[in-house]
Amino acid sequence: MAKGIREKIKLVSSAGTGHFYTTTKNKRTMPEKLEMKKFDPVVRQHVTYKEAKIK
């Protein structure tokens, strides 16, 4: 069976709340770290989420 090219990643809130989202990304087309603005329900506002490895 073929191994998938997409890798699971965790997007961790920069607000320091410990909240995170999980998603996948294609390592071949997006080798750099992912960074995006998403809603953090703990602080109830949009903050920057940065990529981290899933342990």
UniProtKB/Swiss-Prot annotation:
Which keywords does the record carry?
Answer: Ribonucleoprotein, Ribosomal protein
Family listed: Belongs to the bacterial ribosomal protein bL33 family.
Please give the InterPro entries that the UniProt record associates with this protein.
Ribosomal_bL33, Ribosomal_bL33_CS, Ribosomal_bL33_sf, Ribosomal_zn-bd
- Check the record and name the SUPFAM superfamilies matching this protein: Zn-binding ribosomal proteins
Source gene?
rpmG
Q: Which GO terms describe its molecular function?
A: structural constituent of ribosome
Domain of life, per UniProt, equals Bacteria
What HAMAP family does this protein's entry cite? Answer: Ribosomal_bL33 (MF_00294)
Q: In the UniProt record, which is one GO cellular component term?
A: cytosolic large ribosomal subunit
Q: Per the UniProt entry, what are the Gene Ontology biological process annotations, in alphabetical order? A: translation
This protein is called Large ribosomal subunit protein bL33
